[in-house]
Amino acid sequence: LHPMVIMGAVLGAITFCLQGCVQWDGTHIALSMIMLSLLCTIFFIPAMPGAGYEVRGNGEMFPLNGPCWSLFFEYLGNILYALFIHRLSNKALAVLTILLGVALASFAIFDISGYGNMGVGWTLDGINFGGGLLRMLFPFSMGMLLSRNFKPIKVKGAFWICAIALVTLFSVPYLEGATPVCTNGIYEAFCVIIAFPVLVWLGASGTTTVSYTHLRAHETTLHLV
């Protein structure tokens, strides 16, 4: 994915310059800071909020390619996997996954970020970095646990079940209510911790009549999409 990161950073820098090299409040940014931001993005060095190379002024880790924050945490997850997580037994991994699930649920339900949702991790400001780690570590550990213990079950129409379930879950609007607990946080925690892992299990258990050769023939198109 890193070639795409570089491409996105270059396009971000070009777009920022075409827009006049200004932040949201109209402050002009020196070209040297834009080039420094580009270099940091290419080498995946996150920007500190308020730093000169945090050119957009929103506190983003990667102002020239905002979505890179997600891949940044995935890189951290892979490093942790290589150093520690892959050594864990199934029982230890299950305990870790449960603890991370409880931590993530608490973060969302008690609205630790103050956002009313799990939309954290895009900045190093405040609780965002810790929240971003939780957002990455729980699904990462849960995915490993599912992979190690996966046993397909017989389910007819797995594709349609999963598709309808996802459309239904994604159709739910933001849920108001922040006291005593965050209603929207409860819903998002349910989706991430319970619903999505179950859907992954069901989807992996499904069968298809499409051949592997047919899928390979359309691989390039799928990547572009």
Language model region names:
Residues 60-85, 132, 136-138:
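Function-critical hydrophobic alpha-helical transmembrane segments in multi-pass membrane proteins
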Residues 4-73, 103-119, 126, 190-204:
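Membrane-interface helix-loop-helix regions
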Residues 94-111, 162-167:
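Small-polar-interrupted transmembrane alpha-helices in polytopic inner-membrane proteins
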Residues 14, 50-54, 84-88, 119-216, ...:
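Alpha-helical transmembrane segments in multi-pass integral membrane proteins
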Residues 38-42, 75, 79, 83, ...:
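Hydrophobic alpha-helical segments of integral membrane proteins
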Residues 6, 18, 79-80, 149:
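Generic hydrophobic alpha-helical membrane-span motif
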